[in-house]
Amino acid sequence: MSGKGGKAGSAAKASQSRSAKAGLTFPVGRVHRLLRKGNYAQRIGSGAPVYLTAVLEYLAAEILELAGNAARDNKKTRIIPRHLQLAIRNDDELNKLLGNVTIAQGGVLPNIHANLLPKKSAKATKASQEL
């Protein structure tokens, strides 16, 4: 025996990715590589890519959920850039975060200035008062 304890001859455990260890879907290893190659700092800690990956995954899930709701409201089954635009611009926090972002083929929010709306006629007002 080597004196390290444990069972002799036990099979080696299969390696587990950092994404799986953190319970994430987005790739932690790729984010770590991009942080190293991007020259953001001389050294990158081991927890930084995990945290950044979790933030990216959360933001993507949040935007996709709101965009899916916008697509469903428009009776569509496929999310298009218009749905992303509506989702982001109708949410206060996302609109603040992505305020300077232009989404290609996103369009604009529907908005009609109050001065341009038709004025209520006197006949319609009189008729409603008589009832």
UniProtKB/Swiss-Prot annotation:
GO terms for cellular component: nucleosome; nucleus. Pfam families: Histone, Histone_H2A_C. It is found in: Nucleus; Chromosome. There is a cross-link at K126 (Glycyl lysine isopeptide (Lys-Gly) (interchain with G-Cter in SUMO)). GO terms for biological process: DNA repair; heterochromatin formation. The record marks K119 as: Not ubiquitinated. The modification Phosphoserine is found at S128. The modification N6-acetyllysine is found at K4, K7. The modification N5-methylglutamine is found at Q105. A motif ([ST]-Q motif) lies at residues 128-129. Keywords: Acetylation, Chromosome, DNA damage, DNA repair, DNA-binding, Isopeptide bond, Methylation, Nucleosome core, Nucleus, Phosphoprotein, Ubl conjugation. The modification N-acetylserine is found at S2. Its main location: nucleus. GO terms for molecular function: DNA binding; protein heterodimerization activity; structural constituent of chromatin. Gene3D superfamilies: Histone, subunit A. In contrast to vertebrates and insects, its C-terminus is not monoubiquitinated. The [ST]-Q motif constitutes a recognition sequence for kinases from the PI3/PI4-kinase family. The nucleosome is a histone octamer containing two molecules each of H2A, H2B, H3 and H4 assembled in one H3-H4 heterotetramer and two H2A-H2B heterodimers. The octamer wraps approximately 147 bp of DNA. This is Histone H2A.2. It comes from Eremothecium gossypii (strain ATCC 10895 / CBS 109.51 / FGSC 9923 / NRRL Y-1056) (Yeast). The gene is HTA2.
